[in-house]
Amino acid sequence: MKPVGCKESRSRQTSVAGARANYRNLVACLNKAWAPMVARAGGRFRAPSVLMFSGTVSSPCGTHSDSGPPFYCTTNDTIYMNLTQDVGNYNNYPEAYNKVWARMWMLHQFAHEYGHHVQNMVGIFPAYARIRYERATYAKELEDSRRLELQASCFSDIFIGSNRRSYPITGQSLFQWRFLIGNTIDPQHDHGAPAIHKYWAQRGWDARNPTACNTFAASSSKVQ
């Protein structure tokens, strides 16, 4: 991926307006970065919609609450960002390093959900949806889910790595990015263990090329 000179918004997610400014900035950057790559892969690029929610939100993909993560809905090409989480992460902790972590968390989460949009545009998500529910065991279904989610994170960090100089991701931002990619939680075992998530996120950052993110060709040990 070629860098597109993406810079972090000057707004902070202290409020609805601040979070919205960040989401708008990120989706514009991601559209610019991914459009040519989707076209080269034979997909039809289309910009996603972005909605933010607090409390509960209904979508064509079901009802979700702000006690859970943001999500992407393939039916309407929409990224749903958890406003309660993003604003709360920034406002609830006074330490400067925690505020940097909150900014990096929002960046990574947004780019991850956009990664699902990329998967949808190039046909990966529809293929996954067909295959997963034909698996003989629930364990295999979960493995397919981890392959999908780990690839979305790898795609996320292709973008972040490509734009690390302009954004910029340096100093405390780099420290917090490294921390968060290796300290994920996966209670349902459908997103990948922390060390595995770090492995794929780092591959995306280093390679900055989707060919490094083929989780569906990886051995089972690489998608635990």
Predicted region positions:
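Post-HExxH zinc-binding segment in Zn-dependent metallohydrolases
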Residues: A136-R165
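Short pre-active-site segment immediately N-terminal to the catalytic Zn-binding motif
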Residues: Y90-Q109, L142-R146
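Surface-exposed patches in mature extracellular/periplasmic domains of secreted proteins
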Residues: M37-M52, P126-A129, N163-Q176
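Long, well-structured alpha-helical subdomains associated
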Residues: I160-Q224
